Amino acid sequence: MIRINFAYRHSLQTAVFVLNEGGFCRKYGLEGIFNHVPNTQEAEDGLLEGKYNFIFGNHVEPYLDRVRRGEKIIYLAQASNYWPDRLVANPEINSLEDLKGKKIAVLAKGDHPELIVRQRFRDVGLDIEKDKIEEVEVEKINMMKAYKMVLEREVSAAFMLPPFDYKAKKDGLKVIELSPFPQIWGVTLATTSDFADKNEETVMNVLKAFVDAIHYFTTEKKRTLEILSKELTDALELEGDAIEHLYKETVKTLEKKPYPTLEAIRNLYNLTLVAYPEIKVINPLMLWDLHFLRRLDESGFIDGLYK
């Protein structure tokens, strides 16, 4: 078996757990080693140094490093194409406009989740600085910490992913639905162009394992819930109903054929461009290498999983 080191960023990259625990790497001749690496730069440096062969996540930094250091990180596949966040807030908050002059919890200032928060405010005509919305940073992409800050009224609100909307309703917090936001996020399979060029068969086998795991996730609910319960009960302090809610919401977003959409790519690029204008010299499609996925798709492999 070929040993492959993966890095994943956070506990809501649920398809990664199924890829690992479901035995899909072994099925395609791979020994998958899965490393939890919350820090963005640590994950990316590990990929560039060869410590990791693939990473799941890292959506802003590859554009910056392409400009600043000439690094050649590429994206191979995208599991989900829209960001399913909700605003979890204290009961007196009824809209984003009510957050003027208030505190909100944010994950990783200057990084992807916080850039999305800024875009959410821009979409309704607000500006974090001008409208005196104070961002309180939560380190290490710790969504449970952000949630507890709202619950304990340290902040007025936080933009949260499922299942924290479910927990919020049970705990008496306000959950405000937001418009669907096409976005590259979460389980994005990335490597370097050098590794892909030198290891084409391995890349194809990783993609086979990846799409097979997505198929399993969407069609084998009972076993997938068992895997998620094992991984998330302690990590995110979740109970059975919350995990089932997370499962249902995740299935809605997963792509059977994990191609990115142009709208999701554009939105990621644009919100990164606002924060880091230097990336304007890069075409947003420059980082995407989909020929491996297309080859797998045209072979009939993905369609065959769903027959």
Regions found by a protein language model. Give the residues of each.
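Secondary-structure end/capping motifs
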Residues: 199-280
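Small-molecule pocket liners
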Residues: 81-87, 185-189, 193-194, 268
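Short polybasic/polar patches that bind polyanions
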Residues: 26, 67, 122, 169, ...
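Pocket-lining segment of extracytoplasmic ligand-binding domains
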Residues: 145-234
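Short, hydrophobic alpha-helical packing/hinge segments within bilobed ligand-binding/sensory domains
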Residues: 42-46, 143-149, 164-165, 246
